[in-house]
């Protein structure tokens, strides 16, 4: 069941109270790809890609349940993570770190598959709960299932074949107009198929990015909220 209570229990079971989840996208700008209007404002040194400062989205444990819910509400059917063997080491405080040089994360929609390639770092505390989950995305691809466009492509091929087999000048103006109208309709149908569902230049849905942006604002105000609570001081 995709409800907030389920995701709260999930996060409490697998994430530590001070857990953070980071999504670094600094490699997009370095590769020359400039996402339009969606580039995040959070910055930090990224150990995975070496960007200093790196750029991306940072989420705290408090907002993760809502983010998970919105992700699946916005059309994601399934997420799959593939990774090679990790480099494992332990920090002085007892935390266990797993670093994957090659990781692939796939988001499966009904009519689209978004494949992200990058590096992954996961830090577990002594209770084996996640304190840091960091994915550094190098690029992503948007793949459309073959079954989705096969019918339109086949019809376009048939129309082109029929048109080529007519002798030059043998088509009447009405026949030519009919062929052009059919071709335009098929192209519009194919374009509509390729445009749905809508993801932005980072491969995220609009609703999910909006929630990420709200979480950025909440994170930036967290110290102020804690200070107000500790000193019993209101906003006015």
Language model: regions and residue ranges:
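Terminal "cap-and-tail" regions of soluble proteins that handle hydrophobic small molecules
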Residues: 1-236
């Amino acid at each position: 069941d995709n409800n907030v209570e389920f995701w709260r229990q999930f996060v409490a079971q697998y994430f530590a109270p001070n857990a953070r989840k980071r999504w670094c996208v600094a490699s997009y700008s370095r590769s020359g790809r400039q996402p339009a209007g969606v580039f995040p404002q959070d910055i930090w040194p990224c150990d995975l890609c070496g960007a200093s400062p790196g750029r991306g989205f940072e989420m705290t444990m408090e907002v993760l349940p809502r983010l998970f819910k919105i992700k699946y509400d916005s059309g994601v059917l399934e997420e799959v993570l593939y990774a090679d063997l990790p480099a494992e080491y332990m920090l002085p405080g007892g935390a266990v770190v797993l670093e994957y040089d090659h990781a692939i994360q796939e988001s499966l929609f009904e009519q689209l598959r978004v494949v992200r390639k990058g590096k992954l770092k996961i830090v577990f505390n002594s209770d084996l709960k996640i304190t840091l989950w960091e994915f550094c995305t190098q690029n992503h691809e948007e793949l459309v299932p073959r079954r989705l466009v096969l019918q339109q492509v086949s019809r376009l091929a048939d129309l082109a074949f029929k048109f080529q087999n007519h002798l030059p000048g043998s088509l009447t103006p009405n026949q030519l107009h009919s062929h052009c109208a059919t071709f335009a309709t098929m192209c519009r149908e194919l374009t509509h198929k390729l445009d749905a569902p809508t993801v932005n230049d980072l491969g995220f849905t609009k609703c999910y990015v909006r929630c990420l942006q709200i979480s950025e604002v909440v994170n930036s105000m967290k110290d102020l909220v804690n200070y107000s609570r500790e000193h019993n001081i209101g906003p006015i």
